Amino acid sequence: MHRRNFISGTIATAIAATGNLAKAHSSRELPDYNLPEEMLPRTVRIREDLAPFELHVFPDEFGLYWTMPGNVARRYVVGVGRPGLYVPGEFYIGAKKEWPSWTPTPGMLRREPNVYAKWAGGMAGGINNPLGARALYLFRPGRGDTFLRVHGTNNPKTLGRRVSNGCARLVNDQMIDLYNRVPMETRVVLHPPSV
């Protein structure tokens, strides 16, 4: 399915989302990211009658959609995997973690040992952890953990870009908002890029 079949328009009603959103959900102080209006979560109409309560990532538009009843979805602006590292397909949420620890994958260590070797033993959860405040772990039936995540970041400059090792990322306050909506076993679709 292509983006044009999913979204009926780009004009949408903004959802109240501020830098203070996460403070109600976390005892840790998060920065105010001061994102422009177009980077805030919005409720948008979707064209097709997709099942509610699914996650869909469209990499060409850097959009992550949490589908809801009534052919609407909550849209978040995300950063996605770099060319060659974005993996389209169907997944499910196999784990959810608050302030998760992080260890670089074997692939990350092979590709960029100078960047990741110092963290080969892992990093405790916290504001400077690459997975941010929350993470949704993507699993496949029969395979288990894919090492792909939908996770937080404290670097808003990475949103709307192809920057990651395959994961989708949101700023921490928006990730907390999404995390609180998405239950275990939720179906996740990473749609293929158009090129």
Predicted region positions:
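N-terminal export signals
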Residues: 4-24
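N-terminal targeting pre-sequences for secretion and organelle import
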Residues: 168-195
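Gly/Pro-biased beta-strand-loop elements
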Residues: 32-148
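Short, basic/aromatic beta-hairpin or loop at an interaction surface
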Residues: 158-166
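Short Gly/Pro-enriched loop/turn and capping motifs at secondary-structure junctions
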Residues: 141-144, 154-157, 175, 195
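Cleaved targeting-peptide boundary
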Residues: 24-30
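Generic beta-structure capping elements
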Residues: 96, 151-153, 193
